[in-house]
Curated annotation (Swiss-Prot):
Protein name: Tryptophan 2,3-dioxygenase
InterPro entries, per the entry: Trp/Indoleamine_2_3_dOase-like, Trp_2-3-dOase_bac, Trp_2_3_dOase
Sequence positions that bind substrate: F48, I49, V50, I51, H52, Y110, R114, T251
Catalytic activity: L-tryptophan + O2 = N-formyl-L-kynurenine
UniProt keyword list: Dioxygenase, Heme, Iron, Metal-binding, Oxidoreductase, Tryptophan catabolism
Residues annotated to bind heme: H237
Cited Pfam families: Trp_dioxygenase
Family of the protein in this entry: Belongs to the tryptophan 2,3-dioxygenase family.
Its job: Heme-dependent dioxygenase that catalyzes the oxidative cleavage of the L-tryptophan (L-Trp) pyrrole ring and converts L-tryptophan to N-formyl-L-kynurenine. Catalyzes the oxidative cleavage of the indole moiety.
Assembly and binders: Homotetramer.
Disulfide bonds: none
Segment forming the signal sequence: none
Enzyme class: oxidoreductase
Length: 279
């Protein structure tokens, strides 16, 4: 077969990896690509596994970026957090799109391997729980799901007690001289965020004087992007589940679509929404 410019390998390309690290070595592909172990013989179980595993990898990156962004805000380096938060928003778009791939799984196909899942469920995703905690959606009762794993339970309990990105944002607003009630600044951060009039009023000041508070204004918009994307992810999750299992209970024991629909009623960063009506 005649070699062409397109098929001929360049002489400078590295081909000897006996003593050097290769692409596969760096990414640990041997372990990564052998972790998709089907528990049934059904073809479509591979789709189910890969979608969930890749979602967990994206969630790991979200947590990596969120942790750094929260620290930047706590250090009053708001602009440094913008790139991280913009990246989180892009990752969320990938996660949202993944539901359209999973929705190619029909009810008949899912039934072929559903029993193999036992009581394992996406509800038990601890990284998704950590993301929700970092955004301010907290519920200590959720930790009961993880009591069987001592180290993980301890980590999630620490996450529950760590101020969310919204807690740190409101504290940063206070340090800038914006009036925030002491009760909000000293609130129990293990509890779900509840809308507060003083926080809404502070955001109104920011949005009415963008030039003076540009960094806080931009941070508010970045948070709203992330909150909106998280709601879209939840909606697509609910829609995909209903398309595949209808109104049946989830494998983890939840009410399935009914539970996911109730979760949709929760809104992240409520004052960033309500202030728009006040302006």
């Amino acid at each position: 077969m005649k070699q062409t410019d397109a098929t001929n390998i360049e002489e400078s390309i590295q081909t000897d990896f006996k003593k050097d690290m290769s692409y596969g070595d760096y990414l640990q592909l041997d372990s990564l690509l052998t972790s998709q172990q089907r528990l049934s013989d059904h073809h479509d179980e591979m789709l189910f596994i890969v979608i969930h595993q890749t979602s967990e990898l994206w969630m790991k990156l979200i947590l990596h970026e969120m942790t750094a962004a929260i620290q930047a805000i706590a250090d009053d380096q708001l602009e440094r957090s913008f790139k991280m938060l913009a990246r989180v928003s892009k990752i969320q778009q990938q996660l949202i799109q993944s539901w359209s791939v999973l929705s190619t799984l029909t009810p008949a196909e899912y039934l072929e391997f559903r029993d193999s899942l036992g009581h394992s469920s996406g509800f038990q995703s601890y990284q998704n729980r950590q993301i929700e905690f970092s955004l301010g959606f907290k519920n200590a009762q959720m930790l009961r799901v993880y009591e069987h794993e001592t180290a993980l339970f301890a980590q999630l309990n620490d996450d529950l007690q760590t101020p969310s990105i919204y807690d740190e944002t409101v504290r940063a607003m206070h340090r800038r001289g914006l009036p925030i009630d002491e009760a909000v600044l000293n609130r129990d951060v293990t509890q779900d965020w509840e809308a507060d009039a003083s926080v809404e009023a502070a955001w109104a000041i920011v949005y009415q004087d963008v030039e003076q508070y540009w960094d806080l204004y931009e941070l508010g918009e970045k948070l709203l992007d992330i909150g909106s994307q998280q709601q879209m992810w939840r909606f697509n999750h609910m829609s995909t589940v209903e398309r595949i299992i209808g109104q049946k209970p989830g494998t983890g024991g939840s009410s399935g679509v009914s539970y996911l629909r109730r979760v949709l009623d929760h809104r992240f960063f409520p004052e960033l929404w309500s202030v728009r009506t006040k302006l």
